[in-house]
Amino acid sequence: MLIFPLINDTSRKIIHIDMDAFFAAVEERDNPKLKGKPLVIGADPRQTGGRGVVSTANYLAREFGIHSAMSSKEAYERCPQAIFIRGNHTKYRQIGLQVREIFRRYTDLVEPMSIDEAYLDVTENKLNIKSAVKIAKLIQRDIWEEFHLTCSAGVSYNKFLAKLASDYDKPHGLTVILPQDAEGFLATLPIEKFYGVGKKSVEKLHALHIFTGKDVQQVPEMTLIDLFGRFGFDLYRKARGISNSPVKNDRIRKSIGSERTYGKLLYNDEDIKLELSKTARRVADSLKKHGRKGKIVVIKVRYSDFSTLTKRKTLDVPTQDFEVIERSAHRIFDHLTENNSGVRLLGVTVTALEDSTREELSLTADDFKT
């Protein structure tokens, strides 16, 4: 007997993106000498008297059983040849936020779970792409081309299944769980692999001879509720692929921007300014489309060595005028420290946004005339 009806919305298109060994991958990218070696992000126990914990480890180190939250001492005992790096969390956060902006090219319904993973609802999306799988592939492509980092993607009709799918084929995998396949997929899954089922719950379930999703599917709903309360209620539904929690995006949009990665590096200032102008045009058009204007213009320049500079200019009054944004972007670029490396990415963003219907006068190109 069902306590509540099993309402299952299978019409949604949800993607879960999980960066692959994110911190370690960034360090390998920035220091090629680390590639092909077991790498641990965490304090070196030989320098701390055995204190410290592992933040993450690359896949080579994981083959030795090293994982997040393990003591650095145990990690060293498992793999004495591992390289330990304390890591640069400011750098990881900056890159993670930049990756998040890639997600928002496709949808504003982005729910970050941490700096290196997020849910995206692409049921309706900015590019009107019908296939969630195609969007997932495009995101993987964008992240690789712009950051030389990989991610794994899971695609399904709810967050629970998308999360399981992204973990199924790592690194750089893409797994899809269709509605008709969900119960069969879950039936074979060990209960400890169910996202949201903690260690203590696993122990209780094992004590009841419940080891897989199939075992859960065979237990009556009321029995699970009697044994586990609300957790049992949720588990009964999850084992059947039912989870209707929305992708929550409480973020108030504070900026509108556009950026592009170039397959051929830009070296000439004239070429760079031409591309900045094109980008400024896209931003101005987007501001007008959304009825917004902003007071701060920001440009982003990423060079061939992956170093990134962001500089801003604060205007006297808010604007959505293309020529103002273009002129500001050019002036910011003119004041950047000279860098002989080629430019691989350019971005222009207008921030400190407000409603463009407000009565204050907006800045126009005439304000630049002398």
UniProtKB/Swiss-Prot annotation:
Species: Streptococcus mutans serotype c (strain ATCC 700610 / UA159)
UmuC domain span: 14-198
Matches recorded under SUPFAM superfamilies: DNA/RNA polymerases (SSF56672), Lesion bypass DNA polymerase (Y-family), little finger domain (SSF100879)
Subunit comment: Monomer.
Lineage: Bacteria, Bacillati, Bacillota, Bacilli, Lactobacillales
Positions bearing the site annotation: Substrate discrimination: F23
Keywords: Cytoplasm, DNA damage, DNA repair, DNA replication, DNA-binding, DNA-directed DNA polymerase, Magnesium, Metal-binding, Mutator protein, Nucleotidyltransferase, Transferase
Entry protein name: DNA polymerase IV
Pfam families: IMS (PF00817), IMS_C (PF11799), IMS_HHH (PF11798)
